[in-house]
Amino acid sequence: HEAALFALDAHPKLPAAPSLPRRSATEGMVAQAAWGIPGVMVLDDGSLLVDEAAIDPAAPLVDGGVGGEPFVGLRAFLEVLAGRVGPFKLQLTGPLTLALALHAVGVDADRAFAVAGKAVTARIGAALAAARRAAPGATPVLFLDEPGLTAALDPGFPFELESALDLVSSAMALVEESAIAGLHCCGRADWQAVLQAGPQILSLPVGAGAVEHAGALAGFLERGGWIAWGAVPTDGPLTMAADVLWRHLWAEWDGLTAAGCDPVLLRQRAIITPACGLVGFEPRQAEQVSALAAHLAQRLESQSLGTGVDLGA
């Protein structure tokens, strides 16, 4: 509950459901996603023990809901925001990343692919149903976390790129039926390919190669897409001041503008976030990261208003 209240206080416009793997390793992204798959045991340390003979793509999840140990943070969050009418953010591990994790512990690539798609589909439905019960008047934003997309063009990638994108796209389409669909990828990727999965919001870190795919991002913005810019690094000590982070963000936008992106749309359709999750931080450090992201967002809003740019909602 403390983490849920922190999320509401730190990001009142779009609070995010916390995952708490330091409370229980089963809340780690792979463990959480694999929970309930027949033939997969999630151990207390979050690792997976697989009985490959029991892996069956046709079998339903043993536990496909959000009532188990891996979803304590989510349930606390939904309890705290009960009755909310403003948007809020949920996140689940995407099917491609789960498929890669299953394959890494010995599941045949084709079966891992099929099982992961079904598991994530079931979990999306359960999470959004729980969100509707908690806040029927609100529109949730559900992000699929797909770090696996950073490896999609590597020579040893076990799946065809088109099939991988179709897998993610199918999950995105399900989300979009009752929520705003976001896609988070926490490293450098082929953003033109990633956008083929069809997110309404793309979340990526500043400095992750966006300028190399300016044309694809320009088209995405023109079609109504939003970009969540991970402008506050979360992969090490907090050593950069807000002014430095602002300059990094502005330099990225300058590069995109020079490559053809509409500078007004870049700012109108921007969300400022930490680069990734806060699992490695103590509460005081998490507060600092959140405060930096809020400061950058307020600075963007102030400068945009000063130049007549309408940031909308």
Language model segments and positions:
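Alpha/beta catalytic barrel-like cores
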Residues: H1-A109, Q200, G225, W253-C261, ...
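Active-site capping/gating regions of soluble enzymes
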Residues: H1-A16, P155, A164-V175, C186-A313
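Soluble or luminal CAZymes and related metallo-dependent hydrolases
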Residues: E69-G73, A116-V120, S163, V244-H248
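Short, well-ordered coil/turn elements that cap or connect secondary structure elements
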Residues: G83-V85, G137, E176-S178, E222, ...
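Active-site loop segments of alpha/beta catalytic cores
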Residues: L90, V105, R111-E212
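Active-site-proximal beta-alpha loop/turn segments in soluble metabolic enzymes
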Residues: L98-A112, F143-E160, G230-T239, T273-E282
